[in-house]
Design a protein with these regions (language model features):
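Short loop/edge segments at beta-strand edges and connector loops
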Residues: 86, 244-246
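A glycine-rich dinucleotide-binding beta-alpha-beta segment and adjacent secondary-structure elements
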Residues: 185-199, 347, 407-467
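Extreme N-terminal leader/targeting segments of oxidoreductases
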Residues: 1-7, 25-26, 493-502
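Mid-domain catalytic core of redox enzymes
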Residues: 219, 249-360
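N-terminal glycine-rich phosphate/pyrophosphate-binding loop and immediately adjacent elements
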Residues: 3-138, 438
Length: 502
């Protein structure tokens, strides 16, 4: 690349890497500045004592070879050298008080049968729910089209292209939490509310479960970092350059134009345009000093709901649990007490399906608990208490897991606890929100602006401009963004997808 790139991209997360790939494909000379020592942002994994602990992908949508998202993954190199492990299960629900359970697999007929058995008075609901899933089978999910269909008045072209889906979108512009209230059976209602975050719109879960039934949900063997490393390799092969350990502290402005950035070490990089794929709040209110905002932008960061920050508790275990579903949601008989809050639910994953993450005969178990950001930020100032609380929670959670994974406590070799501050420290995500704006029936309708008012040659990309975030969404958004740049510069948009399928 030349000494001075025409485009600087802040952040080598998925959005930054995808933007860089598509920009390089189209003749732009780009430089990515990343504050961490590795690419990927939230899409990462790390090693502890012979175990690989995955911090990101629960399921990757659009992994069918004929899916548009699958083509996007290939275009940006995410699948090159990586093997996909296709999901056979989605979630298993268990209520400790009643010992009732429900497991959702690829078999939609089995799901319908199990729901009717559990909730015989809810037959009408079961029919509508499974019809909604079937309607999405074979449908190539398009972000813009789905977003349009969730609006009160969808765009005519989207109405026509997805006309068979209209009844399922129009009648379900509600959250999963609201869906659960329509079920008479309390256990099934609870399960419906917890199919994803309770605030998520129902059509989203129709799409997820439809892809599950067709074998189009997957994870990347070896952990999420492999996905990111594939994209970084692709970007560098296309001529792009990544500078690691580059902590951007200021976006340089001249005459209301972005002309470069300054790093924490004083180094300055200049370019014709600056694209921030970093945290939205940090970008707008710190790197730009809050100079280019509107009332609506400020209100968004003050009031819009965020994905709740997480406690991620990982155990490297010297045994396997071959008959346990990959992901379980437990309704606890004795709620946990964490960060001053009562937690009646426990979600855990068992990584038996990926033998590369642990030595032979061993596996990784991970627990996810939503928690309070401010509580942990206050506690971390007292390092001793911070570490004590992490250890207390890890021990308490392990005791609860023993009921569901007999023998686990005696075989734990590694324990690792990530708090909301850990997420913030490694990714700078606002208030530890790992996926940005919470996906709700309201927020999913919006595609937010890439530019800021009054500022030229500057753009934002990533989960803070795409409510709900997620890997396929931000890759697709990066592709559309570079298409827009090409249109502005009067050049044809092109891609260079790998010819050989992974």
């Amino acid at each position: 690349m030349s000494q001075r790139p025409d485009t600087i991209i802040i952040g080598a997360g998925i959005a930054g890497l995808a933007t860089g790939c598509y920009a390089q494909m189209n003749g732009y000379d780009t430089l990515i500045l990343e504050q961490h020592t590795i690419p990927g942002g939230v899409c990462t994994a790390w090693r502890r004592g012979g175990y690989i602990l995955d911090g990101c992908i629960h399921f990757l949508m659009g992994c069918g070879s004929d899916q548009g998202f699958h083509q996007r993954y290939r275009e940006v190199g995410a699948l090159e050298g990586n093997r996909l492990i296709h999901a056979e299960h989605y979630l298993s629900f268990f209520d400790e008080s009643t010992e009732r359970s429900l497991t959702i697999t690829r078999d939609l007929d089995r799901l319908a049968h199990d729901l009717r058995t559990l909730a015989p008075a809810d037959g009408g609901f079961v029919d509508r729910f499974t019809v909604g899933i079937r309607a999405m089978q074979g449908y190539d999910v398009d972000v813009m089209q789905a977003r349009s269909l969730m609006r009160p008045v969808p765009a005519p072209v989207h109405l026509w292209n997805a006309r068979h889906l209209i009844p399922h979108f129009a009648g379900n512009r509600i959250s999963l939490e609201a869906l659960g209230t329509r079920v008479r059976d309390p256990f099934v209602g609870w399960a419906m509310s917890n199919l994803f975050v309770p605030e998520a719109p129902v059509p989203f879960i129709f799409a997820v479960l439809a892809q599950l039934t067709l074998g189009e949900l997957a994870v990347v063997e070896g952990g999420s970092l492999n996905f990111s490393l594939g994209m970084a390799r692709r970007y560098e092969t296309l001529g792009g350059q990544i500078v690691y350990g580059a902590d951007v502290t200021e976006i340089l402005i001249e005459n209301d134009r972005a002309v470069g950035v300054r790093l924490s070490n004083g180094a300055v990089y200049r370019a014709d345009r600056v694209i921030s794929a970093a945290d939205g709040y940090t970008t707008i209110f710190e790197l730009l000093g809050g100079r280019y905002t509107t009332r609506s932008i400020r209100a968004r960061y003050e009031r819009w709901p965020l994905f709740a920050p997480l406690l991620l508790i990982s155990y490297g275990v010297a045994c396997e649990f071959p008959n346990v579903p990959p992901t379980s949601v437990i309704r606890l008989q004795r709620p946990l007490s964490i960060a001053g809050q009562t937690k009646p639910r426990l979600v855990f994953r068992v990584f038996n399906y990926d033998t590369t993450l642990a030595p032979p005969g061993k596996t990784v178990v991970q627990v996810y608990i939503q928690t309070d950001y401010d509580w942990w930020e206050a506690l971390r100032k007292d390092r001793a208490r911070y570490e004590q609380e992490k250890a207390r929670i890890a021990a308490d959670v392990l005791e609860r897991l023993e009921h569901h994974l007999p023998g686990i406590a005696a075989h734990v070799e590694v324990t690792d606890v990530s708090t909301p501050h850990t997420f913030y420290r490694y990714t700078r995500n606002y208030r530890g929100a790992f996926e940005g704006w919470l996906v709700t029936p309201r927020t999913i309708r919006h595609a937010l602006e890439h530019a800021l008012p009054g500022l030229q040659d500057f753009y934002m990309i990533g989960q803070w401009t795409e409510p709900g975030g997620g890997i396929p969404v931000v890759i697709d958004a990066a592709r559309r963004f570079v298409q827009t740049l090409c249109h502005q510069d009067r050049k044809p948009f092109r891609t260079e997808a790998e010819v050989t399928a992974p």
